[in-house]
Amino acid sequence: MAETESCTFHVPSLEEICSILKSGLLKNFADVNVIVTECPDLTKEPFEFPVKGLCGKSRIADVGGVPYLVPMPRLDKVYNVNTVAKKIGLPGAYILGAGATSHRSLGMNAELIFSVQAESTSTLAVNKSYVASVNPGDGSCLLEKYRDRNNDNDFGLLSNLYACEGKPGKVIEVSVKRRIGQDNFVSCMRKSLKEHYGENAVGMGGTFLIKQGKAKLHVMPREYSACPLNTDEDVNGWLKFYDMTAPLICQSVFVSHDPGYDLRLEHTHCYSHHGEGGHYHYDTTPDTVEYLGYFHPAEFLYRIDKPSATHLVGRD
């Protein structure tokens, strides 16, 4: 795996982050409640994580990047969760987030929804990740458990990951209803932090539920585009978009400011227990939507295998 760069994030207190998020969310949602609380047991439904919490030595890893997918895919870009955990100094880490599958592993392109505890010196990896692909039969979304497809812990091209020891502890609980603004849930929180902290980059990771309503998600086709995808319009024409139904469980990573590492500032992938999942864009039912999330700031940023030639296409 290629070069790794790292830096420290600005880490405000949980109480201070609560205050900043609340003031920003109130501009975008009619009902807002943001508090510091004990992380719920995430091994329980609907999350079913392999660990109980989001705490302990928190960090964010931005691996690869969109330039390895578009304009043309770099199928040689294959990464491994266990290797990433070691590179970020946290073997055995719990890792959540959003990325792409390895074509070498699955023989297709698909969305990867990360929920995996990396291997340690004494334990094997516990991979509870999901894969969302386009059903070749009818074009619908097909959601599968990663372990039903493959026993490895690889991924490809790009990912945005939050890693921690998976311990219980204090987290930020965000509960909002009825969207009255234009920003999606994650963008609103990210922009709130950016407005307050400026170039002091704050990184956040966590999980949230879309409890009520519907949301626009996309799933990448199984086959990579035969033609170069040179613009956002090209990319959107290639992707498959869906209106998906709550409840959705969403794994999210966002950073308030890019301190010069060519970061993807936000990336969220969702899964469900009713067969739907993919890349989150925004809710489509503002009057009835309801979100409930649990988040924790990251202490460190790791940038792994940053593309040398970059662009801003396909980063929504």
Swiss-Prot record:
Exhibits ester hydrolase activity on the substrate p-nitrophenyl acetate, in vitro. May regulate DNA damage and repair by regulating HIF1A degradation via chaperone-mediated autophagy (CMA). Zn(2+) binds at H267, H269, H279. SMART domains: DUF1907. This is Ester hydrolase C11orf54 homolog. Its main location: nucleus. Keywords: Cytoplasm, Hydrolase, Metal-binding, Nucleus, Zinc. It comes from Xenopus laevis (African clawed frog). GO terms for molecular function: hydrolase activity, acting on ester bonds; zinc ion binding. Its EC number is 3.1.-.-. The keyword Hydrolase applies. The keyword Zinc applies. Pfam families: DUF1907. Coiled coil: none annotated. It is found in: Nucleus; Cytoplasm. Its cofactor is Zn(2+). Monomer.
